[in-house]
Structure formats: C-alpha cells, structure tokens
Amino acid sequence: MSGIDFKQKISFQRPFSKPSSAEDEYEITRVFESDRGRIVNSAAIRRLQQKTQVFPLERNAAVRSRLTHSLEVQQVGRYIAKEILNRFKQDKKITAYGLDKLLDPFESIVEMACLMHDIGNPPFGHFGESAINDWFTKRMDPNGGSGSEPQSRDQCQVEVLKLREGETELNILRSKIRHDLSQFEGNAQAIRLVHSLLKLNLTYAQVGCILKYTKPAYWSAPIPASHNYLMKKPGFYLAEENYVKELRRELNMEEFDRFPLTYIMEAADDISYCIADLEDAVEKNIFSVEQLYDHMSQEWGAVTPGDLFDKVVGAAFRQLGREQGRRSSEDQFFMYLRVNTVGKLVPHAAQRFIENLPAVFSGSFNQALLEDSSAACKLLQIFKRVAVKHVFNHPEVEQLELQGYRVISGLLDIYSPLLAMPETAFTQLVADDRHRKYPIETRLFHKLSIKHRLAYAESAERIRNLPSEQYEIYEYYYRARLIQDYISGMTDLYAYDEYRRLMAAE
C-alpha cells in the first residue's frame, strides 16, 4: 500500500509553540507524554466524574459517570491500537508505514482521545444538548434566515442577526452564525474546550484524534454522499474554523476527511458503552441478569450452538452460579460478558482498520469500523437495541432527563438578560466589571467563570478592527458562545443546584 506514511499524520507540532525538531524516538515520545500530562491534569477531565453517563444525579458510585466510562474506553482503545500495531509487526509493515519511531505515540494518541472523547458534553448528556439547541433555535430561527436576502417568515429574535435588504455579504454571515449557535454538539465543544477555553496547546495529532465529525456547525448545504457518515453531526464551530484549517494542513487532511486514529477511538467507545449501559441498568435494578439475557436473545433471534451469541452472551450466562461465594452473580456475568465481547470485537475492529487502510489513512472511510454485516457488528447492535428499548425508555431515566432539560433551559432563561444587552453596554460591563444601569446583568456576569470571560474578551479584541456592522454580529456570536460555554461546562449537580438557587427554590 504505497502512500501510507504515518509520519505525515502523527504531527508533534503545537499551535502556540515554536516548531519542534524532535527526531530521536524518546524525544518524540516525550512530546506526547506532555500531552498526556496536560489532559489528565485538566479541569475538564475532573469534571467528568460528576457528569452523567445514563443516570443523571446518581449517588451510587458503582453506576458509571462520564469519567469511569471514559477510563473504560481508554483501555479498549489501547487494546485496539496494540492489536493493530502487532499485526503491522507480524506483516513487517512498521517501517514501511513510517511507524518505527511512533509506536508509543500511536497508542498514546488513541488513549488520550478516548479519555477526552466526552469532555464537551453538557450536563445531563444528550438532553442537555437538546435543551441548548432548542433554546437557541427558537431565538435564532436558523432556517428562516437561510440565504442572503430577508424572508417574510424570518422569526429571528436577535435584531443584529436579522437579514436586511441590500446587505448580501452581511446576511450570509448572519445566516451562518444563526445556524452555528443552533447546533451545539459535544464533539464540537470538545475542540473548543481544549483549544480556545483551556488552551492546553496539545499537538495537532492529539486534537485531530477527537475531531470525530468533520462538518462545521454552520453547515446548511446538502451533505455529499461520499461523506454522509463523517458529516452527520457538527464537528467544530465557526469560532474554531481557522484552527481546524491549520490542523488539517498540519495533518495532511482533506476537507471533511478524518484523522485515521479517530476510527479507533470511535470503535472503543462503541464497544465500551454498549456493555456499560446494560450493567448500570442491572445495578439500578431496572432488570435482572436473567431478564437481560432474555431481552438479548430475543433481539438476536434463533441461537445456535457455537454461533457468536452463544460464544459471547451464552457463555457468560452459563457461568452464573459456577463461582458462588467468590463474587456476586451480576459481577460474574458482566465480567465474562465484557471479556468475551472485547475478545471478539477488538480483533474485528483491528481487522477492519487494516482491510480498509488506504481509506482509513486518508480519512475518507465513510463509516465506523464496527459498522458492517458481520456477526460481531450484529452483536453490538443488539446490545444497543436492548439499551434503547429497556434502559433509555425506563420511567426513572426519562424523569431525570426531563428534569435535566428543564434545568438547562431554565439556566439559559436566567442568563438571557446578558444576551439582550446592547453591544456597547455589554462591552462596558466587561471592561468595568459593572454597569450602573444593569444591576441584574452585572450580578449575572460576575457568576460567569473567569476562564470563559477571558475567552470572550480575547475573541472580542481579535475582531476589534472589523467594520462596525461585522463587529456587532461577531460580538453577539462570541457573547452567545460565552453563555453556552459556561452552562455546558457545568457538572450535573452544579447545574441542578445553581438552577435551584437562582429560582429561589431553597
């Protein structure tokens, strides 16, 4: 396979540092060890311990948080990476593929991407995400503002973003920003978090590995069929567009293509959460192991001795009771289920990576590694279907999700006066840290974290020399990002408590 050289992809350059000239294998490894330290010690990773996986506001420590889930994904990602590299070694491809000094970085990039993969998720998971998008969509009316000319059905509530007669170029920008703000997405927020908010100054390769989707959030045109999977969700915001362009140049990625190691991170997540969600449901007494087995066998269909279901799920179920007294039957079942599942799916993911290496390397492979007609992928799908039918639709889960949706929507309502301020007044509030005519807004502004306020101020300074019409549009954009950044960065418990405090409910 000519043209595959991972040295072209695994860049150890950083956006805020002088170019690195590391050539020795250990010098290169040290660069990525620095990435590991920056990531593991970041506040974003610590906050994952109080963000939900499936069950919001859960007090039982045995039930997974985003952090414990991410640690499990990290381990599976490491396993897949090792499996791929071992097969390259067996085929004597390490040097041919430019990996002779990059074995440790290959693994480390995958591991740290797995650990980071959920850091952009807001409180209450996908329902928190929906709450942010619904709130902004109602005010932005992104579809009513498509194109470059005013439309009678334009329902945008933000004066500076309404389309105006004879302002074609500005209207294109307004439309773009209205779409962008209405498309909050955890993966796009992760890119913003590590680059713009935390300024971790990670290597381009490390950040490239968490760029899971390749569509900008403002995208409103039809999605090309060649990239309909890679572009099915927003991958980055307008605010980070220039950085993503730099990243693509540095990693030799074509527009809308993916970094090759991202496929490994995605497969590790798919393998990990499909089992974890079911184990947490048993821990929460939503169903028993016996009931779970029945649900899975019904989804699989007719089970024949020796088929994959029998080897993975059936073998784990048959272990029930064989080790009485050594561990609980539930722990015993899930230990064997996990071992059996990982033992089958990891080699399959590695094989798919290698079989499709030219497309995977270029980043144009338009599907997940664990998305084919194999028995391994069928097994993964039945795990997911059981979770959808019997876990996510459980009354307790739905009740907590509704509460989470209300909390996030309510917090956006509470902080919305900051978005309603005139640009000049908000600019004065930022500069003076108070505004005599806006006492409520001043107090709300003081509650925003310093990190997010600094990110806004830096963005506002960067656009200071734009023509006034453009400046007003971009200023509102970064102000809205400020509110999204602050609320999406909260933990579940902090968001819940903050909402109760500000609603005077306690």
UniProtKB/Swiss-Prot annotation:
Gene3D superfamilies assigned: Hypothetical protein af1432 (1.10.3210.10), putative deoxyguanosinetriphosphate triphosphohydrolase like domain (1.10.3410.10)
E.C. designation(s): 3.1.5.1
Entry keyword annotation includes Magnesium: yes
Keywords carried by this UniProt record: Hydrolase, Magnesium
Cofactor requirements of the protein: Mg(2+)
Domain of life: Bacteria
Pfam families (alphabetical): HD, HD_assoc
Enzymatic reactions: dGTP + H2O = 2'-deoxyguanosine + triphosphate + H(+)
Any one biological process term the GO annotation gives: dGTP catabolic process
Residue ranges of domain HD in the record: 66-274
GO molecular function, one term: dGTPase activity
Alphabetized InterPro entries for the sequence: dGTP_triP_hydro_central_sf (IPR023293), dGTPase (IPR006261), dGTPase-like (IPR050135), dNTPase_1 (IPR020779), HD/PDEase_dom (IPR003607), HD_domain (IPR006674), PHydrolase_assoc_dom (IPR026875)
Role played: dGTPase preferentially hydrolyzes dGTP over the other canonical NTPs.
Family classification: Belongs to the dGTPase family. Type 1 subfamily.
PANTHER family: DEOXYGUANOSINETRIPHOSPHATE TRIPHOSPHOHYDROLASE (PTHR11373:SF32), DEOXYNUCLEOSIDE TRIPHOSPHATE TRIPHOSPHOHYDROLASE (PTHR11373)
Self-association state and partner proteins as the record states: Homotetramer.
Name this polypeptide is given: Deoxyguanosinetriphosphate triphosphohydrolase
Gene: dgt
